[in-house]
Design a protein with these regions (language model features):
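Anion-binding and metal-coordination hotspots
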Residues: 1-201
Length: 201
C-alpha cells in the first residue's frame, strides 16, 4: 500500500491498510467474492478495454509446513513443489490474456486436475453469463467427456488444449502435407480439421 498510489486515490495514509488489517478483511470480502469479480470485470472492460473472450485456466498448489493430521481442504496430494511431505490446497484460477483474474477456487489438496474444469466452467458462466469464449488450458486438465460437453453446449464453448502425443502422432502424416499459414510475424501454424476438432500445429 505505501509503495503504491492507493494513498492518493483514497485520500488516506498507509496506516489504514497495514498488513494485519488487510488480512482481517479477507473473511468479509470472501462473502462477496462473485459480486466483486463481476464488478471488477466491468471496470477492466471500461478502463482497459479488456476482452473476456479468451480465458486462460490453470491450477497451482500451495503447501503448509504444519504437522498432520490434515483437515478440511488441507490434504496430501500431487505436489508441484516436490513437497510430498506437506499437506496442501489446490488453487484454480482463470485470467484474461491481459492478466486480469475472473475467478478462483481453493480446493482440497488431493483434488485431481481433470476433475476441476466442469464445476469451474459452470461457475464462470453463472457469474459472467454464457458467451462464445475460448478456454486455453494444459492437456492434463480436461477430460474427453468435458470437452464433448463444451462442444455440444447450447452456446458453444471453444477451447485450445494440448493434444496428447499419442494422438498427435496419428495425424503426423496428414499435418506434414498441410501448408503453413502465417498468423502473425514469426508465428506460422498448420491446421487440420477432423470432424468437430481443429488441430493447430
Amino acid at each position: 500500500f505505501d509503495h503504491s498510489a492507493m494513498a492518493d486515490l483514497l485520500g488516506e495514509d498507509f496506516k489504514i491498510a497495514q498488513k494485519d488489517t488487510l488480512y482481517r478483511c479477507h473473511d468479509r470480502l470472501l462473502e462477496h467474492k462473485e459480486e466483486l469479480f463481476k464488478h471488477l470485470k466491468g471496470r477492466w472492460e471500461t478502463l482497459f478495454d479488456a476482452r473476456c473472450e479468451v480465458l486462460l485456466y490453470d491450477l497451482t498448489s500451495t503447501y503448509f509446513e504444519s504437522d498432520p493430521p490434515f483437515e478440511g481442504k488441507r490434504q496430501f496430494g500431487y505436489s508441484r513443489d516436490k513437497r510430498s511431505d506437506c499437506v496442501q490446497v489446490v488453487i484454480a484460477l482463470v485470467v484474461t490474456p491481459e492478466g486480469f483474474p475472473l475467478g478462483y477456487e481453493v480446493m482440497a489438496g488431493n483434488t485431481a486436475d481433470n476433475t476441476t474444469l466442469r464445476g469451474f466452467l459452470k461457475k464462470i458462466e453463472s457469474v459472467h453469463g454464457k458467451a462464445e469464449r475460448v478456454w486455453v488450458m494444459d492437456r492434463g486438465i480436461p477430460t474427453e467427456e468435458v470437452l464433448a460437453e463444451m462442444r455440444s453446449a447450447s452456446t458453444p464453448v471453444y477451447y485450445l488444449v494440448g493434444t496428447p502425443k499419442g494422438r498427435l502422432s496419428r495425424y503426423e502424416e496428414a499435418l506434414t502435407g498441410q501448408p503453413w499459414a502465417r498468423v502473425r510475424e514469426e508465428v506460422s501454424v498448420k491446421l487440420l480439421q477432423d470432424g468437430e476438432e481443429l488441430y493447430v500445429y
